[in-house]
């Protein structure tokens, strides 16, 4: 048998591969593609992988495999890679299971992916209301377990406190070189200082004025900036420098010199100071340090050298300039801060492209219209309606003592309710403007003044004037009440007419405006979509004259006399003779003037303040006497039931309560100026009505009057006269903080190209980008939340460059890997900033700058100790050294030590941020693991109940007060069934 088989074997030809027509149906390549066994490369990746590590890296390493001929085979490979995403192993075993079942957790994760970025009070279009309501309902119950889970993490951090002392050898060597080079920079300053003054950070007087930084002008932009790289083939990615990067990296001495480049020795800053004469010149790092003081703990320690110089000015007296240089190295530095210094350099190289553009081409700040969304009428109308409800009356939280303009003539801005307009805001013009988007206004009396949107402070000023004059003004005389029935009601009818705009002239009572014609005739249109007011004498149009001798109005036109039933202010008392109209009194020589006083007019309707929705044809709407007296302008009466002082006190009590108004619509805008010029002064400046819609909202987007002279506002610096940096860029900007001018030297870290606005998507510009490295110790549990200092850093960048977008690079401190790149838009940053007391931060900044302004010429040192509310001001010794002198060199003679603290620097997690294993396994962040599938019935019962019992409240307080993260584990992964056993 065997011999026969041997004889028959040569008949088989094994060299010919089997074929089916022209295509090979079985080959070695097909075998590899269809085989379920892993390839050699996959086996090598699996053998070198850490336990619990995301296998996205393995997918990138297998990209060099032969191309898959079938789409289904490619999907199988993706599923295999994703399927190997393991749940990380906890550092400390979980104490219990979650109250939510696996199905409930997966359902909530799906909803969290959809609606996590949507604000709670937003009116997003295209969302499923039922799902969104379900998400909000589940979120309430999830937050209860999140609180308990954060308490568990805090206790776990105490058990693993040694994790926070971890610092690799490379990181220790790198940070030591940087810190030693920074210590050498300290020797540039004086060695001995004597204590000059001790003051409080907040000052000894409370601040009640909301303030902010207002960008006056971008003076100079030098250097270039690189593009940011935000897309990587796999995550997490190892942060390490390549050979090319190591060759191009700066030395520690160069890095320290760039960090401590004094603005007092900057020739560019000296030239700009001599031209623009700011009181303060500081760096962006010193600005952040002065803002990063959060009470009541004030945990940050810092020392800032200050140089005060007096520079001569041609044709004027010398000017004192305060130079605030960059902060000195810290005396104490945590391991987390050292780790961040080490990881910041490779992250910078990894997220940078090779291409760069001049920094002068970057769209750093918002344009003069400040918001492109104002072109979108539907969104503007909604926002106006909200603003009008919140800003209907005075805001006594604001300091308006400097806003009184008694004896100063102002314009009269009239508004009329229109059923077609949902909500409007009057514009500061010479002629009355109807609250229509398409209103056309012609103002020949002052043609150089165009229509512009009024800011919130102007509206507050005008309303304050009305309240003050209602109480104090007694100059109107009783003669204006003689014809109360026909005059008062007639003017009130004109005001409350729902089909026609109020007809008034708002000319400026200046020396030129006092020579106006005796009669001005105004055209009114009863159309709901368009109203044109023309201030030319025209016999074809109805005219409105006011006789100042008898104060009687004669209205020509049938439409203005038909609104007897729509009168909203129908009170008839003898006290109505109190009419405050100084212009009428001054012009009582027989000349005729236009209707109304010199203050801005208001229609007698509760919906007529700062963009209120119009009344329409509501004829039966009643208005209280208080509202009618506050809102109507043509004739101001004090009613019998109206106690001016009492009502003002009531309004003050109501308005002193917390309101839901957003404080900083734009972080860099100055919401309230304590020394704001009068309305007449503001109208004297140029304004561009063509770039503004006719009805804008009264928010921080309005452009206030600048503090620079017009010749300096339009002056363009010649970059060839200035010294550009060899690497990077310098941007010099001029800001105003109340009555202070600040010259800030900053830089743009990275840029990206994106559409200029939501409406103009085809126009793409370069915008600034700021990347914040964040070293974390709890990646096995989730993503750590931003601390107060990190939020303040992002906020400071938004102050300097209002068009900035932000990225937070979450870095695992144990593996040195970037495991999440979080993008934060400007809108999301505004929501996060609610955790900061921005008004207090500005108050501290202003108090320190005011204190520095009172010092004499010389060199000083600002010193703040950790957890201290006081500020020490040292002055450089003039050769006289005492025992109490502060030796700066001795203090910074060695490397900074590690602060000793009894508590672990733990930071709570952010329950709204999802990691890949959360999405893949359907696990809610910051919650305990669910029970196994074997107890499905019990799980559903326990999950649907969703216990609402409250847990210990001190948990949230502790997590809120803590400011640093917790631990991580190198072996994070564990099989799902093992996770459930724990």
From Swiss-Prot:
Positions with biased composition (Low complexity): 597-610, 684-697
A Pfam family found in this protein is NARG2_C
Q: Does the keyword Transcription regulation apply?
A: yes
GO cellular component annotations, sorted alphabetically?
A: Cajal body; cytosol; euchromatin; histone locus body; nuclear body; nucleoplasm; transcription elongation factor complex
Q: Mind listing the UniProt keywords for this protein, alphabetically?
A: Nucleus, Phosphoprotein, Transcription, Transcription regulation
Quaternary assembly: Component of the little elongation complex (LEC), at least composed of ELL (ELL, ELL2 or ELL3), ZC3H8, ICE1 and ICE2. Interacts with ICE1 (via C-terminus domain). Interacts with ELL.
Tell me, what does this protein do in biology?
Answer: Component of the little elongation complex (LEC), a complex required to regulate small nuclear RNA (snRNA) gene transcription by RNA polymerase II and III.
Q: This protein is called what?
A: Little elongation complex subunit 2
Species: Homo sapiens (Human)
